Each structure stands twice: as C-alpha cells, then as structure tokens.
C-alpha cells in the first residue's frame, strides 16, 4: 500500500505528467495552490506575532510555484492595526485570495474588513484553468429575525448566540452556490471558514446542493476546505472530502494552565489559554487535476518549547492535538 508521500511522488506525478503532456500548459493542466488557516495575528496576545512565519508560508508557495494562495479566515483580529500584515499576504508574488473568519471582524466593521482583504463581498467564485473555486462566508448571525454579519457595531456577539443562530450563511449564498456549481464545466472546490461537514441546518443544505450537482455530473465537487477548528481532520461524506486545515500557531482551550514560563505569559497574554505550536509555517499545497482528483501535501511541526498538551493539563491527554497537516488524496 502506497504511503501518502509515495502517492504524491508516484501516482499523482503520473497523472500530472499525463495531463501536462496532453494539454497546453495554460489549459487543463493541474492547478496547484497554497492554503493556510487561522494564523490569528494579534501582537502581544498570541504567538507568533511577527511577520516571519507568514513570510515562510509565502516562501513555500513561491518554491512550489503555486498558481495562487488562499487563507481560510481568522487571519488577524484588527484589520486596521494589522493592515501591513494583511498586505504582506495580499501582495505576495502569486495571486492571493481571502476567506473571512469570525475573528477577522473583531475590531472592524464588515466593510472595513472586506476593504483590507480586498473583497467586494464575503462570498464569491473564481476559475483557474477550468477548476472552479467557490468561497462562502459563514459569519452571519440570525438576530431578531434577520441575518446580520458579525463585526464592530453589529449589535451582537456571535459567541453569545445559540448554536443554531451563529456562524450562519446568508440565505443568498445558497442560490449563489447552486449557480456556481451548476455552471461549472470542470471540477469544483468549496472554501469556507467553518466546516460544512456537520449536522447544522446550513451545512446540511450546502451538502444537498453539492449532492444535486454531483448527481447531474458525477465528480463535479470532490473537495471542500475549511479552517476554524484548529485541527487536521478529513471527513468524507457522499463522495466529497471535507478537509479542516490546521492552524500553524495554536489550539485554544477553555481554561487557563500554568505550563509555560512567566516570560511567555508576559510576552503573550493569552498563551496560558492555548496549546502553542513551535512556529513551523504549517500550510498545505493542494493539487487539483482536470478530472477532479486531488492531492494535499501538508507539513509537520512541534510544540512550543517542546511542551506537549498532556504536560500542560491532564485534561488534554486524549484531545489528539497535533501540530501537523497530513497528506491526503482523493
């Protein structure tokens, strides 16, 4: 049985080679893109709060000769103060795209955040050599009978809403998704901040739309990517792979611990509320072929100061926290 690395080096290489030989380089060749999630740039609060890690993520995209890069939300917490950091991504040496996460609007209005991310709206689509990428915005709250995007001045906190009312899609996103999938001539990839593999009403409705598109043309949608949960997880439902891309920095935990030295707590005031990683620029390079087959090449890192989760708290012994994005194929 081939390992994931062997698959990437052999099976996918053969598929890519065949595709490249059979088509012009700019038409039908596999699409390769860089993906990162949940960087949480917030100086003085979380490690790592310089631009060094982001520069390394961008450098990976350059070395891999990607067609574009996309970040899956929670990139930062203040789109005004973090504008230079955002622009380091926006102005990378390859095309870049952005997904809005729930924390991106913490200190700015939705309009201010979109302006910093160079977005007209939170949901949109784009095509690269026949592959369609569909971005959804999962940051609406259902408040007093209306869908309102979270952000400064919105009048509510998504963290105080019930589970059924937070991290919602706007109703207009469903017909948009139907049209985007229905008019695609090649494979489609769906991108969002939070997962669409769950059992909440919006996720179920998205999967119904995806299932209808795949019935009309089998294999139209093979992959969906998200962030939000700070973990590496692949779930396959009805022939579609839903991959949660891990954060390069940390996992938030709902209690404080005393596992890091005082100097760390003085530098980053919320480090005692997280399991911190070692700064490895965790990211993934995804290749999508014209027939919808894909391969994900991840990266592995370590824990901050070499301190494993169970050393921080016995409560974390069975959480499965790991600073890794594994390799996958489909």
Indicate where each model-derived feature is located.
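N-terminal active-site segment of His-dependent metallophosphoesterases
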Residues: 24-84
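Short, well-ordered beta-to-alpha junction loops that form the rim of enzyme active sites
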Residues: 138, 191-196, 228, 299-300
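Short acidic, glycine-rich surface-loop motifs adjacent to enzyme active sites
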Residues: 181-198
């Amino acid at each position: 049985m081939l390992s994931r690395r062997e698959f990437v080096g052999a099976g996918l290489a053969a598929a890519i080679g065949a595709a490249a030989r059979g088509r012009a380089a700019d038409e039908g060749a596999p699409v390769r893109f860089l993906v990162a999630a949940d960087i949480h740039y917030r100086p003085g609060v979380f490690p790592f709060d310089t631009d060094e890690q982001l520069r390394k993520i961008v450098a990976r995209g350059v070395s891999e000769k990607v067609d574009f890069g996309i970040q899956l939300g929670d990139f930062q917490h203040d789109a005004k103060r973090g504008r230079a950091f955002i622009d380091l991504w926006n102005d990378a040496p390859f095309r870049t795209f952005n997904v809005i996460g729930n924390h991106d609007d913490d200190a700015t209005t939705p309009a201010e955040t979109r302006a910093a991310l160079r977005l007209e709206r939170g949901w949109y689509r784009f095509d690269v050599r026949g592959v369609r990428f569909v971005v959804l915005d999962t940051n609406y709250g259902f408040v007093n009978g209306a869908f309102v995007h979270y952000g400064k001045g919105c009048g509510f906190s998504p963290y105080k809403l019930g589970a059924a009312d937070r991290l919602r899609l706007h109703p207009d996103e469903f017909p948009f998704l139907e049209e985007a999938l229905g008019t695609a001539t090649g494979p489609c990839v769906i991108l969002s901040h939070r997962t669409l593999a769950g059992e909440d009403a919006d996720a179920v409705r998205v999967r119904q739309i995806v299932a209808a598109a795949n019935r009309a043309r089998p294999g139209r949608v093979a992959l969906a990517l998200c962030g939000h949960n700070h973990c590496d997880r692949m779930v396959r439902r009805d022939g579609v792979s839903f991959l949660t891309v891990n954060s390069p920095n940390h996992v938030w935990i709902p209690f404080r611990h005393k596992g890091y030295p005082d100097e760390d707590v003085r530098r980053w005031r919320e480090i005692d509320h997280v399991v911190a990683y070692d700064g490895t620029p965790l990211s993934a390079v995804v290749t999508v072929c014209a027939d919808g087959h894909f391969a994900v090449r991840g990266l592995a890192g370590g824990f901050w100061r070499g301190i494993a989760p169970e050393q921080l708290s016995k409560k974390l012994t069975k959480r499965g926290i790991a600073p890794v994005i594994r390799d996958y194929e489909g």
